[in-house]
Amino acid sequence: MKIATFDIETSALAANFGIVLCAVIKPWQGECQVYRLDQLPGARRSDDTKLVETVIAELNQYMILIAHNGVKFDRVFLNTRATKNGTALLNPRGNMIDPVILARKYLRMSYNGLDTIAQYLQTEHQKTPVLGHLWVQAVIDRDEAAMDEIVNHCIEDVYVLEEVANKLVPYVSKINEWGG
């Protein structure tokens, strides 16, 4: 069974105002695959069509996806962009394990963010901070160093996510489109 963790970084929280800057897909206990807007051909810098199409095509090869807040953000953001672009969707009924949903349901945490859960579970990898100005520099100024920091943050998130998911597996009773 093919399983992957993934994360996306976007220019805004709403897909009708933002674009996908990068995505990282990590086959379970495999190597990260990095997809960057600044390294894919596009008509304009604001055109994430090819990136979204490529990421969705790769994600659709997996039976189970793991994404923190993936049910309400990552999958929906990608599908909103794909709908606008007229490209294939990330299966909206595909099986997903969403640690934020598991944490809300089975853990009593002060906050269900990936960083809080990872700190509490003392995972080897921890989230890295990224300051807001880096997004502006990456998007507006086309600052490659800022984009590199955002991509590295996304890569680290996927490592943290895999560790958190591994520790929360005992709480997964049913894998479905609702996050577990």
Task: Please state what every model-predicted region is.
Residues 17, 78-80, 166:
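Short amphipathic alpha-helical segments
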